[in-house]
Amino acid sequence: LALSGGVDSAYLLHCAQAAGAQVQPYFAETQFQPAVERRDAAQLCSGLGLPLKVLALDVLADAQVRRNPPERCYYCKRKIFSAIAAAAAQDGYRLLWDGTNASDAVMDRPGMRALQELQVQSPLRLCGLTKAQIRAGAKAAGLPVWDKPAYACLATRVQPGMRITAENLARIERAEQALFT
């Protein structure tokens, strides 16, 4: 299961574990996620008694991602989920799940194409669960991220066509930390 640190994948992980599924959470650590996302994912897994596998990925090593074309999300998602799929296969898993839900606009998100190509399954969306239903379920389950705001990756703050650098991302993260604390 691809665990982002947000409420959707957290709730999916909780449900999978509660249903008795053999599930392994994977967190892709990239330059595009602030440190708080990994912390939240690790705390969730600790609370559920599950080991979190962290995959350190350099998404900026991909020239297409650095160039930041309008379809950047496709290249980034493809890189991230290919790595998670490879790790999951090596660990003996045949399915890969993500936290996409029925409220997500899948038609205008380039990253969704990558997930489809890699045969990533989205159980929350397939079951018709909306963000509001997921939040209610996560709250009832006592998950600490039940009311966590949705968070898009740091790269979404960079205008398409403007080159993405580690320095720009670090500045964006520092600015957002100042705003949110």
Residue ranges with predicted function:
Residues L1-A140:
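ATP-dependent adenylation/nucleotidyltransferase module used to activate substrates
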Residues R67-P70, L154-M162:
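Short glycine/proline- and acidic residue-enriched helix-loop micro-motifs
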Residues A88, A141-V145, L179:
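Short, well-ordered alpha-helical segments in soluble proteins
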Residues S122-G128, P144, G161-N168:
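Short, surface-exposed loop/turn motifs that are enriched in glycine and acidic residues
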Residues K139-Q159:
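Histidine/lysine/aspartate-rich catalytic loop segments that bind and position anionic ligands
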Residues A166-T181:
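Short amphipathic alpha-helix segments
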